From Swiss-Prot:
<feature type="binding site">
    <location>
        <position position="8"/>
    </location>
    <ligand>
        <name>a divalent metal cation</name>
    </ligand>
</feature>
<feature type="binding site">
    <location>
        <position position="39"/>
    </location>
    <ligand>
        <name>a divalent metal cation</name>
    </ligand>
</feature>
<protein>
    <recommendedName>
        <fullName>5'-nucleotidase SurE</fullName>
        <ecNumber>3.1.3.5</ecNumber>
    </recommendedName>
</protein>
<dbReference type="GO" id="GO:0005737">
    <property type="term" value="C:cytoplasm"/>
</dbReference>
<dbReference type="InterPro" id="IPR002828">
    <property type="entry name" value="SurE-like_Pase/nucleotidase"/>
</dbReference>
<dbReference type="InterPro" id="IPR036523">
    <property type="entry name" value="SurE-like_sf"/>
</dbReference>
<dbReference type="GO" id="GO:0046872">
    <property type="term" value="F:metal ion binding"/>
</dbReference>
<feature type="binding site">
    <location>
        <position position="92"/>
    </location>
    <ligand>
        <name>a divalent metal cation</name>
    </ligand>
</feature>
<keyword id="KW-0378">Hydrolase</keyword>
<dbReference type="GO" id="GO:0004309">
    <property type="term" value="F:exopolyphosphatase activity"/>
</dbReference>
<comment type="similarity">
    <text>Belongs to the SurE nucleotidase family.</text>
</comment>
<dbReference type="GO" id="GO:0008253">
    <property type="term" value="F:5'-nucleotidase activity"/>
</dbReference>
<keyword id="KW-0963">Cytoplasm</keyword>
<dbReference type="InterPro" id="IPR030048">
    <property type="entry name" value="SurE"/>
</dbReference>
<comment type="function">
    <text>Nucleotidase that shows phosphatase activity on nucleoside 5'-monophosphates.</text>
</comment>
<feature type="binding site">
    <location>
        <position position="9"/>
    </location>
    <ligand>
        <name>a divalent metal cation</name>
    </ligand>
</feature>
<dbReference type="Pfam" id="PF01975">
    <property type="entry name" value="SurE"/>
</dbReference>
Length: 253
């Protein structure tokens, strides 16, 4: 078995090292991660300049001067002679639930695997800081082992959020849907030394839909949340209404 491991916090992140150690007994691991923290990079590819790949003398991890998506893209199309059995991303320093998944570099690294036909799992630790990182890595390894032993059909993309709790306090796994957040906080305006305005992106909004069945509800209740995602963004319930709308518009002229 071979696993491609990446993240969005960068190749020096504690979450990456912990996940690597937890997965080593399960498969051959190739690590390819961003050089810098790329939180919020989403599925961006670097097209304006060439990318370079380096290798850490300390860990053997490969890293690229680009995004999480770049990392997986380069590994799959430029380094590996055969497809890995699984792409794994994480462990992220902070949750990726609800709307977070659209911005998340952690989820994006996993998504890039799916783009090339490789099943993928993204792992995030709810709440920042690494208080129970070892416990989260243990859970992640259990989920990966279960997938390798009992693969899901097709090419699944799983988004996993692990409560920041001791292993013994976790209540188990729950399959969930994405919740929803309130809009993010307004940007924070400041002034640079030259008197020019600069802006910091505001904090993410609080949970809007944290009802039972959502990732927010599961993790708040002490469960590991597993949400199956898909690449098809088509709003199927809007197709009929949109056809009627387009038909009326094209006939109006």
């Amino acid at each position: 078995m071979r696993i491609l491991l990446s993240n969005d916090d960068g190749y020096l992140a504690p979450g990456l090292a912990a996940l690597y150690e937890a997965l080593r007994p399960l498969a051959e691991i190739l690590v390819m991660a961003p050089e810098q923290n790329c939180s919020g990079a989403s599925n961006s590819l670097t097209l304006s300049r060439p990318l370079s790949v380096s290798r850490s003398a300390a860990t053997g991890f490969y890293y690229v001067n680009g995004t999480p998506t770049d990392s997986v893209h380069v590994a799959l199309t430029g380094m590996l002679d055969t497809k890995p059995d699984l792409v794994v991303s994480g462990i992220n320093n902070g949750q990726n639930m609800g709307d977070d998944t659209l911005y998340s570099g952690t989820v994006a690294a996993a998504t890039e695997g799916i783009m090339f036909g490789v099943p993928a799992i993204a792992f995030s630790l709810v709440h920042k800081e690494w208080a129970h990182l070892g416990d989260a890595a243990r859970v992640a390894a259990e989920i990966v082992r279960h997938y390798l032993d009992h693969p899901l059909p097709g090419q699944p993309l799983l988004n996993v959020n692990i409560p920041n709790l001791p292993y013994e306090e976790l209540k188990g796994w729950r399959v969930t849907r994405l919740g929803k957040r309130h809009p993010s906080q307004p940007v924070i305006r400041q002034t640079n030394p030259r008197g020019e305005p600069i802006y910091w992106i505001g904090a993410a909004g609080d949970a809007l839909d944290a009802s039972e069945g959502t990732d927010f509800h599961a993790t708040a209740s002490g469960y590991v949340s597993i949400t199956p995602l898909q690449l098809d963004l088509t709003h199927t319930q809007m197709l009929a209404a949109t056809r009627d709308w387009a038909r009326a518009g094209s006939g109006a002229s």
